[in-house]
Structure formats: C-alpha cells, structure tokens
Amino acid sequence: MPKKLKIKLVKSPIGYSWDQKDTVKRLGLKKLNQVVIKDDLPQIRGMIRKVKHLVEVEEIEEGGSNA
C-alpha cells in the first residue's frame, strides 16, 4: 500500500520568510489547523522539512484491509 502524509498547519507563517510562507501555500495549507493529505514523496518530505516548525505530520496507510 502506498503511504500518505497527513499534514496539519499548527503555527502561523506570519513573521517568517517569504519562502517559508510560499512553501506552506504550496503544500495546500491556508488556515490554521487545516489538514491536507499528500503522497509520501521526497519532494513533499523536503517541503515539510523546510517548515517543520509550523506543521505537524503523521504517516497514514492508504486504503483499508479487504481480508
């Protein structure tokens, strides 16, 4: 199963550099406590690393078990 990342904006990017604000925007986060689900890709991991002080990340499994 492909992994997904649950990303939540927990701190406002106001007062931080423009590139960190842009990274938050490109992750799809607009409001505080907003949650987005993204694929677990190296590009997304790099974006998260850049704004790790502003977001909360949780790994989730895609889909359910059909057993």
Curated annotation (Swiss-Prot):
InterPro entries attached to this UniProt entry: Ribo_uL30_ferredoxin-like_sf, Ribosomal_uL30_bac-type, Ribosomal_uL30_CS, Ribosomal_uL30_ferredoxin-like
Any one GO MF annotation of this record: structural constituent of ribosome
GO biological process, one term: translation
UniProt keywords, alphabetically: Ribonucleoprotein, Ribosomal protein
Coiled coil: none
HAMAP family recorded: Ribosomal_uL30_B
Assembly information from the UniProt record: Part of the 50S ribosomal subunit.
Family, similarity comment: Belongs to the universal ribosomal protein uL30 family.
Name this polypeptide is given: Large ribosomal subunit protein uL30
Biological source species: Thermotoga maritima (strain ATCC 43589 / DSM 3109 / JCM 10099 / NBRC 100826 / MSB8)
Record gene name: rpmD
